[in-house]
Regions:
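Soluble N-terminal domains of membrane-associated systems
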Residues: 1-70
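Hydrophobic alpha-helical bundles in membrane proteins
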Residues: 76-298
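Charge-dense, low-complexity polyampholytic segments
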Residues: 67-79
Length: 298
């Protein structure tokens, strides 16, 4: 394979954000086509370098070809879209029916989510897995926040021990996801965005656990919480079904706005310093991958 062809294929694969198996298969087909074209040109008297250069130029921009192939393969089926949104609908159903107060139902749902996430992870990471992974990581994030409710001094000591381990797990999974596509990383952290923003509005640490105040707050704000998860489900369905990458990016920018509006409206702006810090952190964690891909798209 000539250097021109190799460079062309590397650019093509770098721009094509689809399943690795499909991407490698398409790249192999392109490679075969380019090598055949190059051999034909060599038989007509051109040097190997000139032949490979003309073959590459005749095929066109690798970025444009990658975009066209992406739009062909990026659209998921309705089955994949609905299954991707299913965990959001299940959580919304929990709050609608008030089953979130029943530890049995919550435990069953958590076990279901963990099982499906592990199954999907070991089955090649299909497109529907990423929202499920977000809920799979949820206990890791929530545990870190609840550690701050320990007696003064002990909470920070426990957090200093726990947080590095939690970050290791979180970063490992995010990196594995981002290798396929940064947009999937945003799709994955979306459930954590909702949870952290509502934590910030309901209180944190001792305030969250004291005298059942958080239960009363959850009951009061249940409708807004349901709206947040429904918005997340709708955006997930749109993301899976849309073809063009720019529209996928736009669909992921809608939930943060809906959730931010819901939280501020429900709390009437009464969010303390730590609450705003958690809120801004969670919004940034969700929006940064989308912003990076928007810049890359431009």
């Amino acid at each position: 394979m000539g250097s021109n062809i190799s460079h062309y294929l590397n650019r093509f694969k770098a721009c094509l954000k689809i399943d690795k198996t499909i991407r490698d298969g398409v790249a192999e087909e392109l490679c075969t086509h380019l090598e055949e074209k190059s051999r034909e040109l060599e038989e007509n008297g051109l040097s190997k370098e000139e032949a490979s250069k003309i073959a590459v130029q005749s095929l066109g921009s690798p970025e444009l070809i990658a975009q066209q192939i992406y739009e062909t393969h990026a659209q998921g089926s309705w089955k994949e879209a609905l299954f991707s949104a299913l965990p959001h609908f299940l959580v919304a159903l929990l709050f609608t029916s008030y089953y979130w107060q029943n530890i049995v139902y919550v435990s069953i749902m958590l076990a279901l989510i963990v099982g499906i996430a592990i199954y999907g992870w070991h089955r090649g990471k299909p497109i529907w897995i990423f929202p499920w992974l977000g809920y799979y990581l949820m206990p890791v994030v929530v545990t870190g926040i609840l550690l701050l409710s320990l007696p003064e001094g002990w909470g920070w000591i426990a957090a200093l021990i726990y947080i590095p381990l939690a970050l290791f797990v979180f970063i490992h999974i995010v990196r594995q996801t981002a290798r396929r596509d940064w947009l999937y990383a945003s799709l994955m952290v979306a459930p954590m965005l909702v949870t952290l923003t509502w934590f910030s509005s309901l209180g944190a640490g001792n305030e969250l656990l004291r005298d059942g105040m958080w239960l009363a707050s959850l009951q009061t704000n249940a409708l807004w919480i349901v709206i947040s998860f429904i918005a997340l489900a709708a955006a997930t369905i749109a993301f899976i079904r849309l073809k063009a990458r720019r529209y996928k990016i736009m669909s992921l920018l809608i939930p943060p706005l809906v959730i931010l509006f819901s939280v501020i409206t429900a709390s009437r702006g009464n969010i303390d310093y730590w609450g705003w810090l958690i809120l801004l952190f969670s919004l940034s964690a969700f929006a940064i991958p989308v912003w990076m891909q928007a810049r890359a798209y431009q």
